[in-house]
């Protein structure tokens, strides 16, 4: 979960988010070096008082400043493309969840079980219990088994929404009339907070996502208890 005055990314709780964090750091280092090099060149040019009136062309120099940036772009693009294909890969999901966006709440369906669906609304600030974050607590948490691949089918009942949980590296647009899919793998037990990440109206900021990752035995007990009720 994001904390006050946090400048970095949230702690990774899935293999995909770990890779995204690594790529972020890798790209940041490359861009920092490029910025320093360009800044050094500009300062050197401005402070230099010497000129060469007979320098009309430089084939070697033009080749260097064409080839070097091309190689830099390749080194940035390769890990980016690898992550892009990794995010779209769906291999034998253990459980499939359907998340539907509404103005302004989420509804969830466990497609592998009969009659296991519910709506998830934000808990008003006045009703939030001590220790729980405001604007992120919900009345019905999305309970999922840890250390199992989960597929999420995302859609919308009205306008554009976006189902996003940063610590799991998940973000998928909810488009009316269309079913998008994404997968994630919660590596540990805990609470993972997210929010709608597409402006969807007046209460866009008040439709949080709360995933509770639990051991599989606890998940089975919760499913049995929910179906009985």
From Swiss-Prot:
Enzyme Commission numbers on file: 7.1.1.9
Positions that bind Mg(2+): 198
Keyword flag Plastid: no
Principal cellular location given in the protein's record: mitochondrion
Membrane topology note: Multi-pass membrane protein
A GO biological-process term: ATP synthesis coupled electron transport
Cofactor: binding details: Binds a dinuclear copper A center per subunit.
UniProt similarity note: Belongs to the cytochrome c oxidase subunit 2 family.
Complex and partners: Component of the cytochrome c oxidase (complex IV, CIV), a multisubunit enzyme composed of a catalytic core of 3 subunits and several supernumerary subunits. The complex exists as a monomer or a dimer and forms supercomplexes (SCs) in the inner mitochondrial membrane with ubiquinol-cytochrome c oxidoreductase (cytochrome b-c1 complex, complex III, CIII).
Main function: Component of the cytochrome c oxidase, the last enzyme in the mitochondrial electron transport chain which drives oxidative phosphorylation. The respiratory chain contains 3 multisubunit complexes succinate dehydrogenase (complex II, CII), ubiquinol-cytochrome c oxidoreductase (cytochrome b-c1 complex, complex III, CIII) and cytochrome c oxidase (complex IV, CIV), that cooperate to transfer electrons derived from NADH and succinate to molecular oxygen, creating an electrochemical gradient over the inner membrane that drives transmembrane transport and the ATP synthase.
The protein's name in its UniProt record: Cytochrome c oxidase subunit 2
């Amino acid at each position: 979960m994001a904390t006050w005055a946090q400048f970095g990314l949230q702690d990774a709780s899935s293999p995909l988010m770990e890779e995204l964090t690594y790529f972020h750091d890798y790209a940041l280092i490359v861009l920092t070096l490029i910025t320093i090099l360009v800044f050094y060149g500009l300062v050197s040019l401005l402070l230099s008082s010497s000129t060469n009136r007979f320098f009309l062309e430089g084939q070697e120099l033009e080749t260097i400043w064409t080839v070097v940036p091309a190689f830099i772009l390749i080194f940035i693009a390769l890990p980016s493309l690898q992550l892009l294909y990794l995010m779209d890969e769906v291999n034998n999901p253990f459980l499939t969840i359907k998340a539907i966006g509404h103005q302004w709440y989420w509804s969830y369906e466990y497609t592998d079980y009969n009659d296991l669906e519910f709506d998830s609304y934000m808990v008003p600030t006045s009703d939030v219990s001590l220790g729980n974050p405001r604007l992120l607590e919900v009345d019905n948490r999305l309970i999922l088994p840890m250390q199992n691949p989960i597929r999420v089918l995302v859609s919308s009942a009205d306008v554009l929404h976006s189902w996003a949980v940063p610590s799991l590296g998940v973000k998928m647009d909810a488009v009316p009339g269309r079913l998008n899919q994404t997968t994630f793998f919660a590596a540990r037990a805990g609470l993972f907070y997210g929010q709608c990440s597409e402006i969807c109206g007046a209460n866009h900021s008040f439709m949080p996502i709360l995933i509770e990752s639990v051991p599989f035995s606890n998940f089975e007990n919760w499913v049995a208890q929910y179906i009985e009720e």
